[in-house]
Each structure stands twice: as structure tokens, then as C-alpha cells.
Amino acid sequence: KYHGKEYVFIDTAGLRRKNKIKEELERYSIIRTVTAVERADVVLMVIDATEGVTEQDAKIAGIAHERGKGIIIVVNKWDAIEKDDKTMYEFEKNIRNTLSYMPYAEIMYVSAMTGQRLSKLYEMIDMVMENQTLRIATGVLNEIMTEAVAMQQPPSDKGKRLKLYYITQVSVKPPTFVIFVNDKELMHFS
């Protein structure tokens, strides 16, 4: 409990390198991780600041991303590394490059040993939860889309121009939107 709200944390203990443990145990670990991610509202992906983003971190991030979860990248042991005025910027740049498919993920730098910034984690969890369940009115979405189209015209193919009619939000967790167009073949998946 924190400030009268209840939070349940599930520690998967991460995935292991195959050369460190047997494949059967690795398979079980993956199943546990996937199950924990599916149960979660927000995934706290803990990265060791002394190691950076590992292959296992990227796997867990991919699982959470594919399941549309809110994600907070928690960089632990921030107190254990040498820092200068560019350290945080460089670390974030590395995270964003490695996990480029999830630019929406929040990043937080903490120290479990000293307690540095741990209390702020609850505020971040609440904010991510709120963003995951946010509903945006169709009128507001259409205004944003109209402004975007005014700044950057949609592409055309062989003289046929993509027309965006309107956009609406169809679900939350994760927020999902549908855009109605004249020809879906002209619309890029991203």
C-alpha cells in the first residue's frame, strides 16, 4: 500500500542466458514472464545501469509491447555508475535506440539500495495507468488529424491521393484508434 492505494508487484526475476541454465528451465521462465506480463496493468522493466539494455531486457520489453501494456523502464543502480552532465542523455539515447519500437515508454532512474527516486515510481505508475485508460473524444482527434494533414499532405500512389475522412478511438489498454480512409492500400501501417 502506498498513499492508500494498493499496488501488487510480480517479480519474474527476468530471463536467463541459455548458457547459464538448462533449456527446460528457460522455457518455464519465459512462460512465467509472459503470464506475469499478461496479468499486469503496467510493466516495470528493470534495467541494471551497470549493464545497460541486455538481450533479455529487450525480449521482455518486446513481450510487454506486443501485449499493449503500459511500460516504465526502471534503470536501477543509478548510484553505482560514474556520471557527468551527459550520462542520463546518453543512457536514454541508448535505451531509445535499442527499444525503438516503444518510444512511449517512460524512463526512470533509481537506486533500490539508497531508495533514490523510488517514491516517485508510484506517481509514474499512476500516470501510465491513467494514460492507458484515457479516452479522447472523436472531435478532438479529428481536429488533431486535420492539423496534421495541413502540415503534411498524405501520400499518393500513381496519381491517387490518400484521403483521411475521420479518426475515432475504439478501445483503451492500449489506446487504439481507427482512421477511416478512401483507400486502405494507400495507408502505411505505421
What are the functions of these language-model segments?
Residues 1-10, 14, 18-31, 35, ...:
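C-terminal-of-GTPase-core extension/linker across diverse P-loop GTPases
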